[in-house]
Amino acid sequence: MAHYNFKKITVVPSAKDFIDLTLSKTQRKTPTVIHKHYQIHRIRHFYMRKVKFTQQNYHDRLSQILSDFPKLDDIHPFYADLMNILYDKDHYKLALGQINIAKNLVDNVAKDYVRLMKYGDSLYRCKQLKRAALGRMCTIIKRQRQSLEYLEQVRQHLSRLPTIDPNTRTLLLCGYPNVGKSSFINKVTRADVDVQPYAFTTKSLFVGHVDYKYLRWQVVDTPGILDHPLEDRNTIEMQAITALAHLRAAVLYVMDLSEQCGHGLKEQLGLFQNIRPLFINKPLIVVASKCEVKRIAELSEEDQKIFLDLQAEGFPVIETSTLTEEGVIQVKTEACDRLLAHRVETKMKGNKVNEVLNRLHLAVPNKRDDKERPPFIPEGVVARRKRMEIAEPKKKRERDLELEMGDDYILDLQKYWDLMNSSEKYDKIPEIWEGHNAADYIDPAIMKKLEELEKGKKSSEQLLGSMPVSLRVKTRKWWKIRQLAKQIREKKKLKILQSKEKNTQGPRMPRTAKKVQRADLENEMRSLGVDMDDKDNAHYAVRARRSRSVTRKRKREESVPPSSIARSRSRSCSKTPRDVSGLRDVKMVKKAKTMMKKAQKKMNRLGKKGEADRHVFDMKPKHLLSGKRKAGKKERR
């Protein structure tokens, strides 16, 4: 909505939910532990804080409700009357008044009990005062159950109301039920209003939007109105009356020519005269709908006189059919133009126009001489205007040709090219290509030269066949030399690429650190021309075998009792401690120990027994969360 967004009103909880939400928030967001041996001012402050916190929560929520709901005296009269019809203005104001009184009562209760708590001389008395304060607040809210439920229903209905801007350009449809109002709005706009062959299908206001002359227009579909006194009209009809009374719109009064709506033309004219005071200062158009069934010319003279009288009074009558879409666009155009003119006329009568006109200055140049200077209109424009007046047959488009020719049609856009030489339209090579003249790069005798070249090739082959054997052998040797030279060039290119790969800027591994495989070494030597057969006893093969232990383990010697203390003992093999194995020097050992301590910090902080301790403690103890919370069992709050 331009000014009113009723969809943003916060949800109004029920009285029970209201109490539960507030008390739960108090329990969660205030301290919960107090002991009787604490100083008395600390105990008082503990319970005062709970009372004030609860009071503030109630105050904020109730204030939010009061501020979100629209005040009937501050909003547009259209919405004020619409809410009065839908929700009863007195009931609505009474509910908001009750909420406001409840808010003040909660504030007064909190103030009184905080004053009494200042004189509490023990933990028990302060606690009882706190319980009494929270209990009285909850009782006050509990008594507002009906008001809260009513306001929640109003909120839900308000959020479903259509988005109507009372101040923008509007087309308003009205008339008897089932005369074709909803069908018209479905044709003109993208609204999807339900259309059924019975009366009062539309029970509330519906809105669609349409563009005309680069402006945004809203089309409002109203429920049907019956011809009886205002006091007897129901809520559905009063919505249409409210829209007619307050929206500055162009009114489209829809009349059913076929009388299939169940009401004759005289009854429809009677309704028109009944609600005519609502059409004052509004552009009005009479829409004669369902003309595909019966037209005005086919009516009786008495019925035709109805429309003639309306036209005599200055109301345009337009025949329409939503089935064949006849007259629909005409009605929209006529209504929009009349409303635009009416709005301009209204603004010109106001005081703001004079303020704007005083700021404008129209500069007119002085006349230089008596020579006439008529506007110049090219001859082509004049000729085109004449052709348009004659209404000569239109030029056939490619789409029309495609429909005529069917499968024989081929899209040819080159026939429309405007070239100096029309014979160049279908040239395969264009005259200009990317800024260059293509003819400059083409030899006209190229095909002739190609034929001569092919002839020369054939003659050379014939010449080779007619050569003596000695010359042919020399030619073959020359051919082999060329093949070898080609292989050498390719080898050089590979070497260059390998050299480029070696010349990278990344980290390099020294040659001595690289592990050389025996097979790779033998392949490389063979490629250089070295015979690598029967090399099992060569130095590189023996060294490779020595690198891994091939000797058998020494047999364990028989244990002999010690003959003397002084006998020689062999020194046991020394073993590196585990905490320093794999570490280079003392500096690295210190760094490893520091990292180990950091890794153990989190485990120690969580009180884990070790790395394998994955125990998860019970986050929801059963003795606190099991069982039902019935009335009188909520002491822990």
Curated annotation (Swiss-Prot):
Cellular component terms per the entry's GO annotation:
cytoplasm; nucleolus; nucleus; perinuclear region of cytoplasm
Q: Show where the OBG-type G domain sits.
A: 169-340
**Which Pfam families did the record assign?**
NOG1 (PF06858), NOG1_N (PF17835), NOGCT (PF08155)
| Parts forming coiled coils | none
The UniProt annotation puts the region (Disordered) at 499-518, 525-637
Where located?
A: Nucleus, Nucleolus
* GO BP field: maturation of LSU-rRNA from tricistronic rRNA transcript (SSU-rRNA, 5.8S rRNA, LSU-rRNA); negative regulation of cell migration; negative regulation of cell population proliferation; negative regulation of cell-cell adhesion; negative regulation of DNA replication; negative regulation of G2/M transition of mitotic cell cycle; negative regulation of protein ubiquitination; protein stabilization
**A Gene Ontology molecular-function term?**
GTPase activity
Cross-link Glycyl lysine isopeptide (Lys-Gly) (interchain with G-Cter in SUMO2): give the residues: 103, 332, 535
Q: Please explain the role this protein plays, according to its UniProt record.
A: Involved in the biogenesis of the 60S ribosomal subunit. Acts as TP53 repressor, preventing TP53 stabilization and cell cycle arrest.
Q: Could you tell me what this protein is called?
A: GTP-binding protein 4
Q: Give the organism the record lists.
A: Rattus norvegicus (Rat)
